[in-house]
């Protein structure tokens, strides 16, 4: 392998929500290669916490007015989206807000469990206009990545209001590539990277996490030679052999509903072969993918004659479907 100039990383400016970093020297072209890759990962793949739904006493939908409260439910939902959280919980947790008027309701009025912290306690939520006004609210917090619209989640019970969740703690990333000198050579790159966060994560920690994500993905390619280059078929741990042309088929070709498609994509399931390798229990374990979506996936596979091309002990085939295929009734 050719020698690569090993760069040094330096933090040239730091604040609670801002960091400016310098990486140099880089071989020509590597400034944009690293800068663009880090920027994309920083904006999309850093985990964070957000409110995913709320429940307000006496309110059944987001268009309802609340007696004694200046804002209606829709405005409160918009204000709740601005609460920035730091959560150490593996599962969704609940926070409680109970406030009587008159007065202003802020994020600091919310009671949090020990593993959740509000980093902007002065954030405005609502105003109670009278002494008999009361606002009782339950907020559900979850950790995830990126942005999750309310319409892409399972329907919630009556009385609960879903919230568009902005999980990513990184607000903005800029990078600039400049020329730098090594000895008499002036065509090396200097990468200047600026990161703005919401305060729930330090810019330096976000940069480190983004680099680890890139390393994990790159390691898959680096280990490519460990696999048999002559292998033309892909098999799972259960001995199921899937022809490569079927395995590599994108899930877009199944023409799934938007909801089912988004569930698979968020779980990094992008190929039909990945679906065929999973049994029903594994598929149902995919976040927000229920029995209805499971049945839809199975029907789409049968519709496109993808299941009959495989042994009838295929992971996704249950006993009833296998019987139908053997009888010819599933064609």
UniProtKB/Swiss-Prot annotation:
Record-level GO BP terms: DNA-templated transcription
Catalytic reaction equation(s): RNA(n) + a ribonucleoside 5'-triphosphate = RNA(n+1) + diphosphate
Keywords of the record: DNA-directed RNA polymerase, Nucleotidyltransferase, Transcription, Transferase
Domain of life: Bacteria
Entry GO MF terms: DNA binding; DNA-directed RNA polymerase activity; protein dimerization activity
Membership in a protein family: Belongs to the RNA polymerase alpha chain family.
Domain-level remarks: The N-terminal domain is essential for RNAP assembly and basal transcription, whereas the C-terminal domain is involved in interaction with transcriptional regulators and with upstream promoter elements.
Function statement: DNA-dependent RNA polymerase catalyzes the transcription of DNA into RNA using the four ribonucleoside triphosphates as substrates.
Protein name as annotated: DNA-directed RNA polymerase subunit alpha
Source organism of the structure: Herpetosiphon aurantiacus (strain ATCC 23779 / DSM 785 / 114-95)
Taxon lineage: Bacteria, Bacillati, Chloroflexota, Chloroflexia, Herpetosiphonales
Gene coding for it: rpoA
């Amino acid at each position: 392998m050719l020698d690569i100039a090993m760069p040094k990383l330096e933090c040239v400016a730091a604040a609670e929500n801002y960091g400016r970093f310098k990486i140099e020297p880089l071989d020509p072209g590597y400034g944009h290669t690293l800068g663009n890759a880090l920027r994309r990962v920083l904006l999309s793949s850093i985990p964070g916490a957000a409110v995913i739904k709320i429940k307000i006493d006496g309110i059944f939908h987001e268009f309802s007015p609340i007696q004694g409260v200046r804002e209606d439910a829709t405005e409160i939902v918009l204000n709740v989206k601005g609460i920035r959280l730091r959560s150490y919980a593996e599962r969704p947790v609940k926070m409680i807000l109970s406030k009587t008027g008159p007065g202003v309701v802020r994020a600091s009025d919310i009671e949090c469990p020990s593993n959740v912290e509000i980093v902007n306690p002065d954030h405005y939520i609502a105003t109670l206009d009278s002494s008999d006004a009361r606002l009782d609210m339950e907020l559900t917090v979850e950790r995830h990545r990126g942005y999750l619209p309310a319409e892409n989640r399972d329907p919630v019970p009556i009385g609960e209001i879903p919230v568009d969740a902005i999980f990513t703690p990184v607000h903005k990333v800029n990078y600039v590539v400049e020329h730098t000198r090594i000895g008499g050579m002036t065509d090396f790159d200097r990468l200047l990277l600026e990161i703005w966060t919401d305060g729930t994560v330090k810019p330096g920690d976000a940069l480190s996490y983004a680099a680890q994500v890139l390393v994990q993905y790159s390691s898959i390619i680096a280990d490519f030679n460990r696999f048999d280059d002559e292998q033309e078929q892909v098999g799972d741990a259960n001995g199921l052999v899937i022809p490569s042309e079927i395995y590599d088929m994108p899930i877009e070709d199944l023409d799934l509903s938007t909801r089912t498609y988004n569930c698979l994509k968020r779980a990094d399931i992008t190929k039909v072969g990945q679906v065929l390798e999973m049994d029903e229990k594994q598929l149902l374990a995919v976040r927000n993918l229920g029995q209805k979506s499971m049945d839809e996936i199975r029907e789409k596979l049968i519709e496109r004659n993808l299941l009959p091309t495989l042994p009838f002990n295929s992971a996704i085939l249950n006993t009833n479907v296998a019987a139908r295929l053997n009888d010819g009734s599933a064609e």
